[in-house]
């Protein structure tokens, strides 16, 4: 049994908001930890499920009786202490740690539903990938959660393909977490030790870092870059072209992060360039995502079959989301607002293919300025 270096009078209650492919995989490992560490966590882990019917049965009923998410994570047995719940308020109330794992376009609606319903001492972790863009600048999704719910939110991001994690194949991740002083106080701290105990498994290693901005930006932009990789795959250009896309993508990600103050991103400290090259949330996540994730698959299908992005998403993902499609638009809007399009030729070229009938054949010319 793991012993906390800090006294824990009442074990922490953990819940998961989201039950898609990645949401269920994360819920599985968290529930495993909660069952094994009763001195730190309460045993049962509620997982909010957007209710659907599968062959005449409610998805929550299937998960709770057969312990399998047959739609989003089939053929993976889930812990019996993972409880599917269709009521979002009931899921989060009284939770000490709330893990958000939903498509980022739904975040605003979800947090509004639970505003004022969560414990003021709760903490949150965002597994979402994306940015909240407005004419004034850019907000991290974790900051959006904090601003609405008035609880501190960190970020989990890394080279994590959901099915591999769910099968127990070894991988690692980054948790970016730095609690500001105004959120500290008696009974209010869930420290990095607790987070590591909640997420770390023998097959899922966790490194806790402080760079929330860097991890968030890398997690958002890698999905756009992965779309570019899918485009060149669809065009049949091979591994050399994919490597070039990833190199330019890393460079543009670091450049994007350097504008964090201009973009008015709230942060306790500036992004650390080492996050992008040394942490799982950086280059490792980019490599994994560009090696065959859903963004690559959708983008590849677009080019091979000459269909638009949303049609490809519907056909390939069957109801799930390709976050790169939406993020490409958000990033373009941000760069346009600050007149920075010319500094990000890859991100802009990707946007044009998705939204302006641009051609992947133009990539070599559009990226010439990066050389």
Swiss-Prot record:
<feature type="binding site">
    <location>
        <position position="294"/>
    </location>
    <ligand>
        <name>NAD(+)</name>
    </ligand>
</feature>
<feature type="binding site">
    <location>
        <begin position="294"/>
        <end position="295"/>
    </location>
    <ligand>
        <name>substrate</name>
    </ligand>
</feature>
<keyword id="KW-0560">Oxidoreductase</keyword>
<dbReference type="GO" id="GO:0005777">
    <property type="term" value="C:peroxisome"/>
</dbReference>
<feature type="active site" description="Proton acceptor">
    <location>
        <position position="222"/>
    </location>
</feature>
<keyword id="KW-0134">Cell wall</keyword>
<dbReference type="InterPro" id="IPR017751">
    <property type="entry name" value="G3P_DH_NAD-dep_euk"/>
</dbReference>
<dbReference type="InterPro" id="IPR008927">
    <property type="entry name" value="6-PGluconate_DH-like_C_sf"/>
</dbReference>
<comment type="similarity">
    <text>Belongs to the NAD-dependent glycerol-3-phosphate dehydrogenase family.</text>
</comment>
<dbReference type="InterPro" id="IPR013328">
    <property type="entry name" value="6PGD_dom2"/>
</dbReference>
<feature type="binding site">
    <location>
        <position position="323"/>
    </location>
    <ligand>
        <name>NAD(+)</name>
    </ligand>
</feature>
<dbReference type="Pfam" id="PF01210">
    <property type="entry name" value="NAD_Gly3P_dh_N"/>
</dbReference>
<dbReference type="InterPro" id="IPR011128">
    <property type="entry name" value="G3P_DH_NAD-dep_N"/>
</dbReference>
<dbReference type="GO" id="GO:0005634">
    <property type="term" value="C:nucleus"/>
</dbReference>
<dbReference type="GO" id="GO:0051287">
    <property type="term" value="F:NAD binding"/>
</dbReference>
<dbReference type="GO" id="GO:0042803">
    <property type="term" value="F:protein homodimerization activity"/>
</dbReference>
<dbReference type="Pfam" id="PF07479">
    <property type="entry name" value="NAD_Gly3P_dh_C"/>
</dbReference>
<keyword id="KW-0843">Virulence</keyword>
<dbReference type="GO" id="GO:0009986">
    <property type="term" value="C:cell surface"/>
</dbReference>
<comment type="function">
    <text>May catalyze the production and accumulation of glycerol during hyperosmotic stress conditions. Glycerol acts as a osmoregulator that prevents loss of water and turgor of the cells. Mediates evasion of the host innate immune system by binding inhibitory components of the host alternative complement system, in a manner dependent on estrogen-induced inhibition of EBP1.</text>
</comment>
<dbReference type="GO" id="GO:0005975">
    <property type="term" value="P:carbohydrate metabolic process"/>
</dbReference>
<keyword id="KW-0963">Cytoplasm</keyword>
<feature type="binding site">
    <location>
        <begin position="18"/>
        <end position="23"/>
    </location>
    <ligand>
        <name>NAD(+)</name>
    </ligand>
</feature>
<dbReference type="GO" id="GO:0006072">
    <property type="term" value="P:glycerol-3-phosphate metabolic process"/>
</dbReference>
<dbReference type="GO" id="GO:0042784">
    <property type="term" value="P:symbiont-mediated suppression of host complement activation"/>
</dbReference>
<feature type="binding site">
    <location>
        <position position="129"/>
    </location>
    <ligand>
        <name>substrate</name>
    </ligand>
</feature>
<dbReference type="GO" id="GO:0005829">
    <property type="term" value="C:cytosol"/>
</dbReference>
<feature type="binding site">
    <location>
        <position position="106"/>
    </location>
    <ligand>
        <name>NAD(+)</name>
    </ligand>
</feature>
<keyword id="KW-0520">NAD</keyword>
<dbReference type="InterPro" id="IPR006109">
    <property type="entry name" value="G3P_DH_NAD-dep_C"/>
</dbReference>
<dbReference type="GO" id="GO:0046168">
    <property type="term" value="P:glycerol-3-phosphate catabolic process"/>
</dbReference>
<dbReference type="InterPro" id="IPR006168">
    <property type="entry name" value="G3P_DH_NAD-dep"/>
</dbReference>
<dbReference type="GO" id="GO:1903561">
    <property type="term" value="C:extracellular vesicle"/>
</dbReference>
<feature type="binding site">
    <location>
        <position position="162"/>
    </location>
    <ligand>
        <name>NAD(+)</name>
    </ligand>
</feature>
<keyword id="KW-0964">Secreted</keyword>
<feature type="binding site">
    <location>
        <position position="50"/>
    </location>
    <ligand>
        <name>NAD(+)</name>
    </ligand>
</feature>
<dbReference type="GO" id="GO:0005576">
    <property type="term" value="C:extracellular region"/>
</dbReference>
<dbReference type="GO" id="GO:0009277">
    <property type="term" value="C:fungal-type cell wall"/>
</dbReference>
<comment type="subunit">
    <text>Interacts with human CFH/complement factor H; the interaction is direct and enables the pathogen to evade the host innate immune system. Interacts with human CFHR1/complement factor H-related protein 1; the interaction is direct. Interacts with human PLG/plasminogen; the interaction is direct and provides active plasmin on the surface of fungal cells.</text>
</comment>
<dbReference type="InterPro" id="IPR036291">
    <property type="entry name" value="NAD(P)-bd_dom_sf"/>
</dbReference>
<keyword id="KW-0576">Peroxisome</keyword>
<dbReference type="GO" id="GO:0141152">
    <property type="term" value="F:glycerol-3-phosphate dehydrogenase (NAD+) activity"/>
</dbReference>
């Amino acid at each position: 049994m793991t012993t906390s270096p800090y006294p824990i009078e009442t074990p922490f209650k953990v819940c998961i908001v989201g039950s898609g492919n990645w949401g269920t995989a994360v819920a599985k490992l968290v529930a495993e930890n909660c069952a094994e560490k009763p001195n730190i966590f309460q045993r049962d882990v509620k997982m909010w499920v957007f209710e659907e019917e599968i062959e005449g049965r409610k998805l929550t009923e299937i998960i709770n009786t057969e312990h399998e998410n047959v739609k989003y994570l089939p053929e993976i047995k889930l812990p019996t202490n993972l409880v599917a719940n269709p009521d979002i308020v009931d899921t989060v109330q009284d939770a000490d740690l709330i893990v958000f794992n939903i498509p980022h376009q739904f975040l605003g609606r979800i947090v509004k539903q639970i505003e004022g319903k969560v414990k003021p001492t709760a903490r949150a972790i965002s597994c979402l990938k994306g940015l909240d863009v407005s004419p004034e600048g850019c907000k991290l999704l974790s900051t959006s959660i904090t601003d609405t719910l008035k609880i501190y939110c960190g970020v989990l991001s890394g080279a994590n393909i959901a099915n591999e994690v769910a099968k127990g194949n070894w991988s690692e991740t980054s948790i970016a977490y730095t609690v500001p002083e105004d959120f500290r106080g008696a009974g209010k701290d869930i420290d990095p030790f607790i987070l590591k105990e909640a997420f770390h498994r023998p097959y899922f290693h966790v490194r806790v870092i402080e760079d929330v901005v860097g991890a968030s930006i890398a997690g958002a932009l890698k999905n756009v870059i992965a779309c570019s990789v899918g485009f060149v795959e669809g065009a049949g250009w091979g591994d050399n072209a994919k490597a070039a896309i990833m190199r330019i993508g890393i460079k543009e990600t670091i450049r994007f992060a350097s504008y964090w103050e201009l973009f008015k991103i709230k942060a306790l400290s500036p992004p650390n360039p080492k996050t992008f090259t040394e942490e799982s949330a950086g280059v490792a996540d980019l490599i994994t995502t560009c090696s065959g994730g859903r963004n690559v698959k959708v983008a590849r299908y677009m080019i091979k079959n000459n269909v638009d992005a949303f049609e490809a998403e519907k056909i390939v993902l069957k109801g799930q989301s390709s976050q790169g499609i939406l993020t490409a638009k958000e990033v373009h809007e941000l760069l346009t607002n600050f007149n920075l399009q010319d500094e990000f030729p890859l991100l802009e070229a990707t946007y044009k293919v998705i939204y302006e009938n641009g051609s992947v054949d133009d990539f070599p010319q559009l990226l010439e300025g990066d050389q």
